[in-house]
Amino acid sequence: MNAGRGDELTVAEPTGPCAAASVSPRALPGPADPLLDLRLASLREEQPRESSPVTGPIPLRRRRIGDSSLLVFPVAINGTGFGRTIDAVSAGGILDAYRGFGGNFIDTSSAAAGGRSESIIGDWMRSRRARSDVVIATRVGSGTGSPGVSQAAISTAVDRCLERLGTDHVDLLYLDTDDPSVSFEETLLAVDALIGAGKVRFFGLAAHAENRLVEARVITAQLGVPPVVALQVHYSLLRRDLFEGTLAGVVAEQGLGVTARFPLGAGFLGGKYRSAVDLAACPRGRSAVTPPTRRRLRVLAVLSQIARERHVAPATVALAWLLAKPRVVAPVPGVSGPEQVLDLVAAPSVQLTRHEVAALDRVSS
């Protein structure tokens, strides 16, 4: 166990509200997808036993989120595209595949698709009777429903989240807006009230600088209320500056768990966009990494070389690099289809050597 990277546990027979079911996607309730089954089978065959031992559910490694009791699979599923670019049927297939591989950590936002993302996740949990198998994280504070971090705004936003999710609590609530016009005391007391009411188990921050993390720790100690346990931050091989440095130092000092947003650079690190021509031809590519700099293409080249040597996808290596970093509990990649899930959940099984990590560090610095 490496305390610098968060507590890790290998669970043989998971039980309890945070444990994932040890089942294959084919065994899950709901309509079968033979094309997905064939794709997953072919992907398994591509993984050599020595580097990515994928023969069914991924070995159930769990990481603890900060000082909480939440034990999660080291790769979360980003559900913010559900209801926007991903319809309910495709979202269900993604979640089925993820759960089938042992995944139990679903991340979304109250603002995603105007709340539709939470509704789709809630419908899926009900249809699969999966609420006790998964850890649900959502964010409040932005969007049009109940924006802001005042006591009234947070309380209203969480109640609406719970209604859409069809549950009586969220496991991890992030505040994704930092509003200096609202006292931090009011915001933190509002969260404390929700925790006391059983509507929220733990909370984190998602749009806050290091000085606000320090301030939050001081205020929660003075008020005697639960502290921040997690930070969600934009962090990837393409964007290291927002986290590494002073912010990472504060996170380590406070023992927070980090979840990394945009860990694949909006798809660029998945290897789809291998040239400036590819990027120019794809609107998503242009919006993700404009301009297509030489540095970014060099990062992709080194990433792809390591992936080829290990017989895994570039996305798998990009996530494995993050998982090798201190305090990172789980990257939160987006996914557009069930066939992509294996490349993501395979990342915890890929233990990069220090030379591979160093090569990626150098090219991305």
Cite the ranges covered by each PLM segment.
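A short, structured active-site edge motif that brings together acidic residues
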Residues: 132-144, 231-235
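Acidic (Asp/Glu)-rich catalytic clusters
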Residues: 66-69, 100, 122-133, 162-166, ...
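Beta/alpha (TIM)-barrel catalytic core signal, keyed to glycine-rich beta->alpha loops juxtaposed to Asp/Glu
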Residues: 15, 20, 28, 32-35, ...
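Active-site mouth loops of central-metabolism enzymes
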Residues: 78-89, 140-152, 176-181
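Short acidic capping loops at alpha-helix termini that bridge into adjacent secondary structure
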Residues: 73-74, 107, 131-134, 168-172, ...
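N-terminal binding-site loop/beta-alpha segment at the start of enzyme catalytic domains
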Residues: 4-134
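Short, acidic/polar
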Residues: 86-98, 149-165, 213-218
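Active-site groove signature of glycoside hydrolases
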Residues: 162-183
